[in-house]
From Swiss-Prot:
The modification N5-methylglutamine is found at Q151. One of the primary rRNA binding proteins, it binds directly near the 3'-end of the 23S rRNA, where it nucleates assembly of the 50S subunit. Methylated by PrmB. It holds the Pfam family Ribosomal_L3. GO terms for molecular function: rRNA binding; structural constituent of ribosome. GO terms for biological process: translation. The keyword Isomerase does not apply. This is Large ribosomal subunit protein uL3. Belongs to the universal ribosomal protein uL3 family. One of its GO terms (cellular component) is ribonucleoprotein complex.
């Protein structure tokens, strides 16, 4: 099991393949991605690499973390993330990870934070159909309707789909195919859409569930 990398979502575009079909692509940029530290089975109970990305001013780093970066002999990083690895896949501290860590045609899993939508109603949040547009319905056209039963059980069960905060959730999209890798521009072109807003950070790692399809 290899380490993943931290990348930045740039935006979306599209290309046409040999069959004339349009393929949607999401562009992610890999820049200043370095190994900050190791987590070992003997000391921590598991094997992992600590990956950091994007340089940060030393004045904005806490004293304990300054020592961590000083020991690694690298500049402070804005984002840090651990990636579990197998024992044979350790990489030297301060080593850089580039876009060629992945190859075109490979399948990857993307973990990112979805765009926040604020307080949303049941139709937007859970795709409810709403109530009738006419025939006696007044004011409550977009209402979710009844939320419970009667005196027994006399309560609304936990987990009931209702209006509430939507978005800002950590989600993982599995088995996205890498269309191309541009080493010169430090870009990875991934087929399909990826959660998150432009310039947001996400993690890219090898797909856990291997699939074999022709796209």
């Amino acid at each position: 099991m290899r380490t993943g990398i931290i990348a930045q979502k740039i935006g979306m575009t599209s290309v046409f393949n040999d069959k004339g079909e349009r393929i949607s692509l999401t562009l992610v940029k890999v820049d200043d991605c370095q190994v900050v530290g190791h987590k070992t089975l003997e000391k921590h109970g598991y094997n992992a690499l600590v990956i950091g990305v994007k340089d940060k001013k030393i004045s904005r780093v806490t004293k304990p973390m300054r020592q961590v970066f000083a020991n690694a002999k690298i500049s402070p990083k804005t984002k840090l993330k651990e990636f579990r690895i197998s024992e044979e896949n350790f990489i030297d501290i301060a080593a850089s990870l580039e876009v060629d860590h992945f190859t075109a045609g490979q399948f990857v899993d993307i973990t990112a934070t979805t765009i926040g939508k604020g307080f949303a109603g049941s139709m937007k949040r859970h795709n409810f159909r709403g109530l009738e547009a006419s025939h006696g319905v007044s004011i409550s056209h977009r209402s979710h309707g009844s939320t419970g039963q009667r005196q027994d059980p006399g309560k609304v069960f936990k987990g009931k789909k209702m209006a509430g905060h939507m978005g800002c959730n950590k989600v993982t999209i599995q088995n996205l195919k890498i269309f191309a890798v541009d080493k010169e521009r430090k870009l990875i072109m991934i087929q399909g859409s990826i959660p998150g807003h432009k310039n947001s950070y996400l993690s890219v790692k090898d797909a856990i569930k291997k699939i074999s399809i022709t796209v």
